[in-house]
């Protein structure tokens, strides 16, 4: 069999709070790599503490890509990510470095590695019309309308998910075809890379739960509430009728802090709700990761030497 001459890339996945960011940096230092963030929240400027965003020292130690590229009142789609990540990968490979893609946003990984079917681009006027109808009639009503034209997509979207309802209706109104119909098209060509998929996840669920709780407490101690308050009072966000519908503000921890600052519940309830929401996020991520049948799983506390051996075998073959 001829040797596989495609450039190598590392895909490092895992649930939140599993230690992916530091491991990605360690791999980059050891093997001459650059890190590409695969995270739908790290793209936003100003969301630092609550996202456990790699700090300045970490980002100075090895090059990082696709962090702090959007304002929090902007939208950034999986298609946007796939386009930007491909450009970053091409640049890294041309430099002779190793692309290391790390994060926990499954949709972004799928968009990049498996490809997305072509869909109509965003249409600002149609979006504005849908938003106005939602303000008048409610997103639940628009969800019902979506079900009438695209029952398959509506069944996958919760009635309280305005971003996805809006996009599904936008696709239908712009093209006259349902989103599910578009998604049934063959995807674009996959990446021409030789990929090693690693999953970093504690073996025992209790360990992950402990890490989640400790990390959120540290976020609060490090000024998360002040960070959220700065976002709440930013003119571009404060002027919005429904700022909590922004993708950035729907991130785990940020919505709960916002609601606490609005007086909806106590500091203790804020902590409990945020930890519970983060656990649910981790559970969803683990469910998705179990479907990645070609991925190798590692425990962050016990498998460092095993990761080293797997990396060496992959890169030297």
UniProtKB/Swiss-Prot annotation:
Reactions the enzyme catalyzes: adenosine(37) in tRNA + dimethylallyl diphosphate = N(6)-dimethylallyladenosine(37) in tRNA + diphosphate
Required cofactor names: Mg(2+)
Pfam families, alphabetized: IPPT
Keyword tRNA processing: yes
UniProt xrefs under SUPFAM superfamilies: P-loop containing nucleoside triphosphate hydrolases (SSF52540)
Keywords attached to this entry: ATP-binding, Magnesium, Nucleotide-binding, Transferase, tRNA processing
Family named by the database record: Belongs to the IPP transferase family.
Record PANTHER family: TRNA DIMETHYLALLYLTRANSFERASE
Protein name: tRNA dimethylallyltransferase
């Amino acid at each position: 069999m001829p040797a596989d001459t495609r450039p190598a890339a590392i895909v490092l996945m895992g649930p939140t709070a599993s230690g992916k960011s530091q491991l990605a940096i360690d791999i980059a230092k050891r093997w001459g790599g650059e890190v590409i963030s695969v995270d739908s929240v790290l793209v936003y400027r100003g969301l630092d503490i609550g996202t456990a965003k790699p700090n300045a020292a970490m980002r100075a130690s090895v090059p990082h890509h696709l962090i702090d590229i959007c304002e929090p009142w902007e939208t950034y789609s999986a298609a946007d990510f796939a386009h930007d990540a491909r450009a970053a990968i091409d640049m890294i490979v041309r430099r002779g470095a190793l692309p290391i893609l790390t994060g926990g946003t499954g949709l972004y990984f799928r968009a990049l590695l498996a490809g997305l079917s072509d869909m109509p681009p965003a249409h600002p006027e149609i979006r504005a019309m849908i938003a106005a109808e939602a303000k008048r009639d409610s997103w639940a009503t628009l969800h019902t309308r979506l079900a009438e034209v695209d029952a398959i997509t509506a069944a996958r979207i919760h009635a309280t998910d305005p971003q996805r309802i809006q996009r599904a209706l936008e696709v239908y109104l712009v093209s006259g075809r349902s989103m599910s119909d578009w998604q049934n098209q063959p995807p674009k060509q996959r990446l021409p890379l030789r990929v090693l998929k690693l999953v970093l996840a504690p073996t025992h669920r209790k360990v992950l739960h402990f890490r989640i709780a400790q990390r959120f407490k540290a976020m609060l101690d490090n000024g998360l509430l002040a960070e959220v308050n700065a976002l709440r009072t930013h003119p571009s966000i404060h002027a919005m009728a429904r700022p909590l519908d922004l993708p950035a503000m729907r991130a785990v921890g940020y919505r709960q802090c916002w609601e606490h600052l609005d007086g909806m519940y106590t500091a203790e309830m804020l902590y409990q709700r945020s930890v519970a929401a983060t656990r649910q996020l981790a559970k969803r991520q683990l469910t998705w990761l179990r479907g990645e049948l070609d991925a190798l799983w590692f425990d962050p506390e016990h498998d460092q030497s095993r990761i080293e051996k797997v990396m060496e075998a992959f890169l030297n073959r």
